[in-house]
Amino acid sequence: MTIVWSPTAVEDLEHLRATIEQYNPRAAAKVARAILRRVESLAEFPGMGKPGRIPHTRELVIPDTPFIVVYTTVEQTVKIVTVLHTARK
């Protein structure tokens, strides 16, 4: 499957990295890599996330981080909708 990031998801990832980087640049890079690696695995395993709170979405927990990736699947495409901090509702 092809992975496509929405503009919102790209902005979310950039924002969280910039925020973490203010306090710990190494941690910011580590978190961004963890998110990107986990998202890449959706190409082979698009059903690995749990059913989302919003209809027709799935939520992928990023291990060892407080982040969740919300995504949808349509035909052969996984669309990354947003990246959320678990404290956000």
Positions of PLM-derived features:
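Enriched for short, Lys/Arg-rich terminal
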Residues: 62, 66-68, 72-89
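Basic, Lys/Arg-enriched alpha-helical interface segments
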Residues: 2-57, 74-77
